Amino acid sequence: MAVVLERVARYAIPIGIGFTLLQSSIYDVPGGKRAVLFDRLSGVQKQVVQEGTHFLIPWLQKAIVYDVRTRPRNIATTTGSKDLQMVSLTLRVLHRPEVGMLPQIYQNLGLDYDERVLPSIGNEILKSVVAQFDAAELITQREVVSAKIRQELVQRATEFGIRLEDVSITHMTFGKEFTKAVERKQIAQQEAERARFLVEQSEQERQANVIRAEGEAEAADIVSKALDKAGGALIQIRRLETSKEVATALANKGAQVTYLPFGAGSNAQSSSGSGLLLNVNP
């Protein structure tokens, strides 16, 4: 039994040491990541290690793993516009490292490269671009401002080995004085629109009155011409129609009324020649 234990102890230690060395010489690079090897003798290796399982020399070499997937980051700053209005801006940046430049990124910036670079260049470019526009232009030409910021920021980030997939303005606010001035301007524009509407409405009503008056004048002219053409006959017809209406009204009130055509007898003549007989017994 003692011999067996001695043999186990004899082989267990080398096996354990070998297993430990093997385990420490293997490392994994997960999906969406890349690795950079640092050698204690030669420094950072230029080759970028791809995804998968790889070997290294324990103690002499160390693997530094980078996430190369696109990640979002917000950059906020407060600066002044061309007309000295205070503007607060927030940018949303989608970024990732250039895979081929990972060794240089590790040498110059380290693992927190985005924290070191993006806020600095973001604030620099935001202040530079915003200073080229008035506060009103920042609102009316927002797409132009955003495109200019994107162009300069992409170019600047490339110098540090960072690729920007998208840059957009997500938040923009102005100082209280400018906000109040914009509100006053909007109220003035609304009042001007209302006044213009009232003027147009009055003009339409005036035109309608003119058209109505012209129509009435034309109708009166037609009636006048008809009277001139028909002579007394038309007047006599109107008189008879009026007499009928009066007789109907009196009959409805209980009066005994007899209607005779105009000129139907001497007794039928009234002082006005209306052709009505009142209180006539049948």
UniProtKB/Swiss-Prot annotation:
Membrane topology classification: Peripheral membrane protein
A single Gene Ontology CC term: mitochondrial inner membrane
GO annotation terms (biological process): mitochondrion organization; mitophagy
Keywords in alphabetical order: Cytoplasm, Membrane, Mitochondrion, Mitochondrion inner membrane
Main location per the UniProt record: mitochondrion
Subunit text: The mitochondrial prohibitin complex consists of two subunits (phb1 and phb2). The subunits assemble into a membrane-associated ring-shaped supercomplex of approximately 1 mDa.
Stated role: Prohibitin probably acts as a holdase/unfoldase for the stabilization of newly synthesized mitochondrial proteins. Involved in mitophagy; may act as an adapter for atg8 that supports mitophagosome assembly. Negatively regulates the proteolytic processing of atg32 via the i-AAA protease. Acts as a negative regulator of the m-AAA protease.
Stated name of the protein: Prohibitin-1
Species in which this protein is naturally found: Schizosaccharomyces pombe (strain 972 / ATCC 24843) (Fission yeast)
